Each structure stands twice: as C-alpha cells, then as structure tokens.
C-alpha cells in the first residue's frame, strides 16, 4: 500500500488484520512515528546550516526506507541499510519511485560502519540502540540521531534490564520520562568517550513511548572529558519528592531525606545532568518545520517547549505536587507565572502537559504558590 508523508509517496506493507495501516508482517513501518520523522527532517535542514560540510546520511535500520527517502529529498547523499533483503528491495523501490538518488545495502549496520564513514548516522531500532552505539559513535563524523523505544528499562520500571543495557541505575520516579532520556544520553556519552569523542545533545525529546536524541560529535580527549564531567547522580525522596543532583562518577547517597527525614531515598545514575538541547538550535529546527509535514503543528509546539525549557536535571509533575500539598491545582501557566513572580526561574517542560521545571526547591515552590493563594484570599476579603 502507498502512503504520503512529507510530500513524498512511499510503499509500505499491507496491514495485518487488526493492525495499524502499514504494520503488516515482514518489513516494518510505524505510522505513529511520523512526528519523530518530521522532527528528524527539520533537524537535518537546520544542521546543514550549522555544519555545511555534513552531506552523507545513513538510515541504519531502513525497513521501508522512509527515513532515507526523506533525507534524500533534502539533498543528503543517502544510504539505506538493513539485514532484511526484502527491506533493502523496498527501500530501493521507494527511492526510485520518488526520483531520488541513494544507495541501498544489504548489510549488518555494525559491519557497514566499520568500513564506511558517514556524516550523519540515524539509529532507529526496535528496542534499545545500545548494540549499535559503539559502531555509530566511533565512526560517524558529525551527528548521531538515536531513538530508544525500551522506555521501561530506561526509566527504571524494569530496573535490572536498565542496569544491564545502559550501565546505570535508573529509578522509577515521578519524572520518569526525563529519567529515561538522561539514562540514554549518559550511556551514549560514555560510549563516545571511549573513542575520545564528545557527544553533546543538541535536541532531545520524549514522545509517545520513545526517547529521541541528536548528538553532535567532536573529537578529542579533553572535550570527551568535558562531557564526562556532565555525568552524575540524583538522590530522590519518594515521600516529599525532594531531589538533589550531584556531578561526578562516585555516588555518595544519603541515608535520609534532609527535608522530611524519610529513609525512602533512591539514588539514580550515572545520568546525564547537562542540557538535553541547545536552545538556539532547537529554535532553528522549529523554523525548519514546514506545513507539508503531517505532524507540523505538534512538531512546532514540541520544539518551542524544548527551546524554552530550563536545563535543570529534573522536572516536577504539577499534579503530584498538589497531591502532596493537599490542595486543588491551578492552571499550568499561572503556576509558572507565580514561581517567576517569586523570583525563581521556571518553565514548562515537554515531557507531559503538567511538567514544570524551576530553580526553586519544593518547599520554596509551596511557599511561592500557596502563599500567593493565601494572599489572594486575603485581598478578596
């Protein structure tokens, strides 16, 4: 069957009975990842302005070839690789059907990457990208784009699996989407550092059961060390929601929460504690979203939020805070405005509609929010 995406027409598998369109047996196509692909195209457009020499693109798990086709339409010298010969054939047909140049290769991507160098490598596997991370980060020149769909291990819901795959201890906290993203980036940064490379996230997001990050590479032991310095641990109180990030690779967990005295404190790490995006680049990516994209509205909203988001290592769930405070919640925009009015930095966060970031501690937030409510009640009298 044929589908249209980003102004292009590609053939995808027929749907099985009861399955979503295009998700039939054999070659896989995921229609729910259109937002992911739209943002990827916008990133490729913006990155060409940032690094004009970046010209070659590897779609490392091509399947139908939709990512490679869209990259080729942007003028990238595209290679589509897959271990499934049917996928390679379908990707070639889709390139030809759109009058686009590109190479299709029946190869294991790890072997391919140790024989060829690409400016941009896109890893979009089913599940964890870790089996492909070494080859990609060691051999890409400029940019590695990574999707992870195994969100339960990443966020700590499947703790042992997360430890095995990512070499970190993720914890299932009230900010679990961000926990997963920072666990993923930590593993990728540590992998790149083994090859004396810095891997810095310039755009990242968590959407619909997957995490996605775009890592810009720079060679050199010193810059790799600088990235390692952005790793650390976070102590989290399960009762009052206190959390404390600490940079460094040696954990020093606390026994009790310094705010409420609870001994239910979880320590997570090593996590990436640095920014997950470059705000200027995120804004540039947003500007390169075009109306022919099926998820243009969502992409612009997402990227706008990412660009404005504070780079503090964790977000708070406003509903969870109000539950702890025993008060009815106010609107999110008013919540953020009250924090800013009290002198704290604050922003919404893209992870969910009730996600907020602030430089205020939880007691400071409570005073800023509920104190204002008390003042408002007094004025009304």
From Swiss-Prot:
Where is the stretch described as Disordered? 1-30
A Gene Ontology molecular function term of the record: tRNA (guanine(26)-N2)-dimethyltransferase activity
InterPro entries with a match to the protein in the record: SAM-dependent_MTases_sf, Trm1, TRM1_arc_bac, tRNA_met_Trm1_C
| Residues noted as binding S-adenosyl-L-methionine in the record, renumbered to the chain | 37, 67, 82, 108
Q: Which UniProt keywords apply?
A: Metal-binding, Methyltransferase, RNA-binding, S-adenosyl-L-methionine, Transferase, tRNA processing, tRNA-binding, Zinc
Catalysed reaction(s)?
guanosine(26) in tRNA + 2 S-adenosyl-L-methionine = N(2)-dimethylguanosine(26) in tRNA + 2 S-adenosyl-L-homocysteine + 2 H(+)
| Boundaries of every Trm1 methyltransferase domain copy | 1-369
Which residues does Zn(2+) bind? 237, 240, 257, 260
Task: Enumerate the Pfam families for this protein.
Answer: TRM
Source taxon at top rank: Archaea
**What EC number(s) does its UniProt record assign?**
2.1.1.216
- Report the transmembrane regions from the record: none
Q: Which GO terms describe its biological process?
A: tRNA N2-guanine methylation
Its biological purpose: Dimethylates a single guanine residue at position 26 of a number of tRNAs using S-adenosyl-L-methionine as donor of the methyl groups.
Q: Which family does it belong to?
A: Belongs to the class I-like SAM-binding methyltransferase superfamily. Trm1 family.
* Stated name of the protein: tRNA (guanine(26)-N(2))-dimethyltransferase
Name the encoding gene, please. trm1
């Amino acid at each position: 069957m044929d589908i249209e995406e980003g102004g292009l027409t590609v053939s995808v598998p027929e749907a099985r009975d009861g399955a979503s369109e295009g998700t039939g047996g054999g070659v896989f196509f995921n229609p729910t990842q259109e937002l992911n692909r739209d943002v990827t195209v916008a990133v490729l457009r913006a990155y060409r302005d940032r690094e004009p020499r970046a010209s070659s693109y590897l779609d490392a798990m091509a399947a139908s070839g939709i990512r490679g086709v869209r990259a080729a339409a942007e003028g990238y010298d595209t290679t589509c690789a897959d271990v499934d010969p049917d996928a390679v054939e379908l990707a070639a047909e889709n390139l030809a059907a759109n009058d686009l140049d590109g190479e299709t290769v029946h190869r294991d991507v790890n072997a391919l990457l140790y024989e060829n160098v690409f400016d941009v490598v896109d890893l979009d596997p089913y599940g964890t990208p870790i089996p492909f991370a070494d080859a990609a980060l060691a051999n890409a020149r400029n940019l590695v784009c990574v999707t992870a769909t195994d969100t339960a291990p990443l966020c700590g819901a499947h703790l042992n699996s997360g430890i095995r795959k990512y070499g970190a201890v993720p914890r299932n906290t009230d900010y679990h989407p961000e926990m997963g993203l920072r666990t993923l980036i930590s593993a990728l940064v540590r992998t790149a550092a083994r090859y004396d490379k810095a891997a810095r996230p310039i755009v990242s997001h968590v959407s619909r059961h997957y995490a996605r990050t775009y890592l810009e590479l720079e060679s050199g032991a010193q810059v790799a060390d600088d990235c390692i310095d952005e790793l650390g641990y976070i102590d989290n109180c399960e009762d009052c929601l206190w959390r404390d990030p600490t940079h460094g690779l040696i954990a020093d967990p606390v026994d009790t929460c310094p705010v409420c005295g609870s001994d239910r404190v979880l320590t997570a790490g090593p996590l990436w504690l640095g920014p997950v995006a470059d705000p200027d680049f995120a804004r540039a990516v947003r500007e390169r979203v075009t109306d022919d994209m099926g998820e243009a509205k969502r992409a612009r909203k997402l990227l706008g939020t990412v660009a404005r988001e504070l780079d503090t290592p964790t977000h708070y769930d406003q509903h969870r805070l109000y539950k702890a405070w025993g008060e009815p919640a106010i609107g999110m925009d008013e919540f953020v405005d009250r924090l800013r009015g009290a002198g704290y930095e604050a922003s919404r966060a893209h992870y969910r509609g009730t996600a907020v970031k602030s430089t205020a501690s939880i007691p400071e937030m409570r005073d800023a929010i509920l104190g204002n409510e008390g003042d408002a009640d007094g004025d009304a009298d």
